[in-house]
Curated annotation (Swiss-Prot):
Protein name (database record): Apoptotic protease-activating factor 1
Domain remark text: The CARD domain mediates interaction with APIP. The monomeric form is autoinhibited in a closed conformation through a bound ADP at the nucleotide binding site. Exchange of ADP for ATP and binding of cytochrome c trigger a large conformational change where the first WD repeat region swings out, allowing the NB-ARC domain to rotate and expose the contact areas for oligomerization.
CDD domains in the record: CARD_APAF1, WD40
Molecular function, one GO term: cysteine-type endopeptidase activator activity involved in apoptotic process
Source species of the chain: Mus musculus
GO BP annotations, alphabetical order: brain development; cardiac muscle cell apoptotic process; cell differentiation; cellular response to transforming growth factor beta stimulus; forebrain development; intrinsic apoptotic signaling pathway; intrinsic apoptotic signaling pathway in response to endoplasmic reticulum stress; kidney development
Record's keyword annotation contains Protein biosynthesis: no
Function: Oligomeric Apaf-1 mediates the cytochrome c-dependent autocatalytic activation of pro-caspase-9 (Apaf-3), leading to the activation of caspase-3 and apoptosis. This activation requires ATP.
Pfam families: APAF-1-like_WHD (PF21296), APAF1_C (PF17908), CARD (PF00619), NB-ARC (PF00931), WD40 (PF00400)
Other known facts: Physiological concentrations of calcium ions negatively affect the assembly of apoptosome by inhibiting nucleotide exchange in the monomeric form.
Amino acid sequence: MDAKARNCLLQHREALEKDIKTSYIMDHMISNGVLSVIEEEKVKSQATQYQRAAALIKMILNKDNCAYISFYNALLHEGYKDLAALLQSGLPLVSSSSGKDTDGGITSFVRTVLCEGGVPQRPVIFVTRKKLVHAIQQKLWKLNGEPGWVTIYGMAGCGKSVLAAEAVRDHSLLEGCFSGGVHWVSIGKQDKSGLLMKLQNLCMRLDQEESFSQRLPLNIEEAKDRLRVLMLRKHPRSLLILDDVWDPWVLKAFDNQCQILLTTRDKSVTDSVMGPKHVVPVESGLGREKGLEILSLFVNMKKEDLPAEAHSIIKECKGSPLVVSLIGALLRDFPNRWAYYLRQLQNKQFKRIRKSSSYDYEALDEAMSISVEMLREDIKDYYTDLSILQKDVKVPTKVLCVLWDLETEEVEDILQEFVNKSLLFCNRNGKSFCYYLHDLQVDFLTEKNRSQLQDLHRKMVTQFQRYYQPHTLSPDQEDCMYWYNFLAYHMASANMHKELCALMFSLDWIKAKTELVGPAHLIHEFVAYRHILDEKDCAVCENFQEFLSLNGHLLGRQPFPNIVQLGLCEPETSEVYRQAKLQAKQEGDTGRLYLEWINKKTIKNLSRLVVRPHTDAVYHACFSQDGQRIASCGADKTLQVFKAETGEKLLDIKAHEDEVLCCAFSSDDSYIATCSADKKVKIWDSATGKLVHTYDEHSEQVNCCHFTNKSNHLLLATGSNDFFLKLWDLNQKECRNTMFGHTNSVNHCRFSPDDELLASCSADGTLRLWDVRSANERKSINVKRFFLSSEDPPEDVEVIVKCCSWSADGDKIIVAAKNKVLLFDIHTSGLLAEIHTGHHSTIQYCDFSPYDHLAVIALSQYCVELWNIDSRLKVADCRGHLSWVHGVMFSPDGSSFLTASDDQTIRVWETKKVCKNSAIVLKQEIDVVFQENETMVLAVDNIRGLQLIAGKTGQIDYLPEAQVSCCCLSPHLEYVAFGDEDGAIKIIELPNNRVFSSGVGHKKAVRHIQFTADGKTLISSSEDSVIQVWNWQTGDYVFLQAHQETVKDFRLLQDSRLLSWSFDGTVKVWNVITGRIERDFTCHQGTVLSCAISSDATKFSSTSADKTAKIWSFDLLSPLHELKGHNGCVRCSAFSLDGILLATGDDNGEIRIWNVSDGQLLHSCAPISVEEGTATHGGWVTDVCFSPDSKTLVSAGGYLKWWNVATGDSSQTFYTNGTNLKKIHVSPDFRTYVTVDNLGILYILQVLE
């Protein structure tokens, strides 16, 4: 019955007892079904009318709302209108078994039952936790009137009591399962006398009529019996709720076949009792949204209006209901103390977060401390040892076995006690267990045991050293990942500086750790412990950090590269090089192949960090506003977020259904926007990676997105192929403004520094400026006109304006289109400066430095350039990417800039350290002569001059000539020959540099040139399909003309013969003296890409774009064998010296080794693909060469690889800085190798002795 109805009945009880006659009234109530015949007899048995009336009213008080309404109607019907009027104000609005009132859907029946049972009311500030409440109710339904236990357990302050009360605040549950009522008993930590008092009070509550006994039970056993009888006879189908049970022995007093719901921190308390048991674990946190909701209710603000500190408070306490409520209550009194309470929480000052409340403890540390104090004395120290664990780290059992020097089973038993008492959490992973502490428990332990922490960390390290050697940890060990991630942390925290330096400066440790977890965490440790490592040796620390940062894109790939070989590429002064060389020599004794890069002194690495977060092209990357993070997106449809200093991955989000084209941080760094070819724009929470909004109003792919620069009112601008710009307000679900005006795709947009204007670039050849407030066009600048010549009709010229960037003062803007960067004054639209980057590349992207006059420009030929806009001079040339650079961006302070490329990497460069524009870069046209003690290289540089380089000494002689297209050295280094783009051929005599010119040149660019063995004759081929034989000493010429298309290449044979092959699919054998064809082989339907000649000159091989290779005899016009099976163009081939084997390489990165005699395939050498869709061998295999003993094969592709011919396995890989190697020159003894990559870097490699 409602409390209001009951009060009304009690208030007018005396008047009713005096006046009413019960017999007729009871007839009405029996007919209504609210009074039984037996109850009528009880009333009638009373002696007087007054006693009969008193007995009826007592019965009605024990009934529900229906009885009250029936009694009221009976009074009216029997003429007691005055008495009925007294009861009218107490009439319930609804009956007990139907309908709900307005208070959260709780019926008056529920409210009455809970009030009578002593169930606590909802807290003043309350948020629902529907999932957990439903889980508890499901377990209660399972009791179904039968005896049993439902246990709600969790750590201190997680809201167990509130959840228990909320679970029984349900009409159908009470009516269906617990019609006898609910009885709440607060237990807490009790001794026997305290428990007896609780039981006495409960028995008295349940037997208010004292029908079973006139006195209270004298001991626990008697109380247990009394309780059993009361529950069975007077309160069947009722629920007993025991709140905050600590000890198993307490429950034995209630183990008398009741239905019991209990809350506890120790889930093992029910182990001591009988009957069915159900368990509901309570997560320690509310979740971000629920936590914010509680704070907003306490301070009476909207969730979205809460300050940033509110989010940090929730994050810091992991949504602990107790902490959020304590802080909320304090903020209600002191609304300006957000920062103060956040600081106390961060500093673990729990004593200062104190507030009186309905909870038993005024501060979190009190609530947690009592749990620890209740542990057995013999395991308290073990719990103290957990003080050194880090937040959110799951620790395998084996780690604690090492720490405590105990067997696994013993450790699991100890830890299970902590888990049972909600002092520790456990994750089961297959057969093994991992344990972790809640953040607040970590904070509590850290604060409580602060004076012991250093010793505890030292104990951890010492125990590790007893069990393991750092680099011998095996990946199949349960605890190996923990030690790799946290051993350095324990050493640093233990003040064990010597041990930390020895660990971090060990190439063995670097190798073992990077192979398992990649380089980012190690870089983070070098940054974090730099102050300690620098004490030992600042230079060594820098050596290792630079090694990891610049090789990160390799160290994160599979198969894992040989770290010793990578270390050998470091400068000779580096500690990494010293250790690598030592290891290489030790392993070399066992036959392991290692290579020394002997000319590496001339190479400077300019990048500060190289990361490879994507598995496909990276289209865009950007810094966060604080410069600490980088977001990137690309063709793999993902958004990646990582630390700008170390490359540590923070978020990996499958963002869109198609390529992600652009991403941007909001000005407060709270959000990241992405836009995609799937036509959608998405907003993500930058901390959690949670999707916040999806906008899909563009009708074509969305190319760009950019947030306003100020955070007071966040707007996002997007541009699309649908020709429109759109402005989005993150507080709205739909587009705020659409801007019309462009007549072609919008490629790029940027807000001005003051957010007043929005600049947009389009394929229509214009830059437009828009007023952000009105969304009206303010100005249009026709960029296209700066690319028109007088004879070109404007409609025939397409100028795509790629991007734009504002100057820091907002008065100027740079625009990139084709191969020019233009600087405009936004007030006058006048052109202030023009930068021309050259004819051979297009500008992909540009960015203006925030603090000086530098602009960084990304070019299509893999290069990035820094220009001074004022002086219009190039300041730096940054090479390192292996493919198109799609995006560049300065950091907010301008000290560094990033570049994003098609090669799947992002590089971070320090602005001040990038090299000045003085480096001369080599082209891939080289010739090599190997001498006994020297390797001489003739190379063409980017100025098209010639360089003669002594490999070992590094001495360079410059032979400047313009437009050199190919070159060669005579066998004895007496002469240099070269051809140019115009078809001319010249010879330079060394060392006097006298020049001889061919009187008859080629009509087109010379592509190949070669001296005969005696150096007297020079043979050349060109794009004009003619081979020229020039005896330059006599001036005689022979022209070999028969090929129908360009000659691909040629080789000299014995007896004045020459083998040539062509795009026309033929191979021809010539007599170079007479110029006649001796043999004409029609080899392939496609282009003949290469030929190789056996050492006995009886056979040759041909490879083709038709994916086949063939073996031929010079005596037969039909092939001996056709070699099929390659899935790409077969680009190269080589015979072994003994003529038994032939190796072929294709465009898929596969090398095949064949038996020459029968054409059978012996081995397929295909490196494991790094990522799905990535070419093996880093690209096309362009050259192969056997060792003299035919046991080893070297191949060139994206990098160099050495193979064991007998097994087909890779024996070494040398990763060049660049890629797309065209050829490898190998010394006769197979110990020196020379090549040039596409960055123009020369590699002279020698087998390490």
